[in-house]
Amino acid sequence: METIHIVQPFDRVNKGLKPGQVLQFKTADEAARRAELLADKHAGIVAYSMDVDEEGGDYGTPRVLFESGDVPEL
């Protein structure tokens, strides 16, 4: 099992939100800092960490590190 650190931006399209390119980081701090830097460029952004076991297909509950703007529930 490993822990991944993800930043997911969201952009406004018509009346909804479209997920942008997912960014992955080595540490939770790096992910949170990048999300904070990108926050003013997107309708919403979230940074989170999650434990994953790709071989077994198990994914843990996301732990939000930073959230700003309009973000759908994880």
Across the structure, where does each feature detected by a protein language model lie?
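Residues that cap or initiate secondary-structure elements
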Residues: 13, 29, 53-54
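Residues in well-ordered beta-strands of folded domains
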Residues: 8, 26, 48
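Short, mixed-charge low-complexity intrinsically disordered segments
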Residues: 39-74
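Internal catalytic or translocation cores that form aromatic/hydrophobic pockets or channels
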Residues: 22
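Short aromatic-glycine-(Arg/Gly/Cys) micro-motifs in beta-strand/loop hairpins
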Residues: 1-19
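A short, charged, amphipathic alpha-helix used as a generic interaction element across diverse proteins
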Residues: 25-44
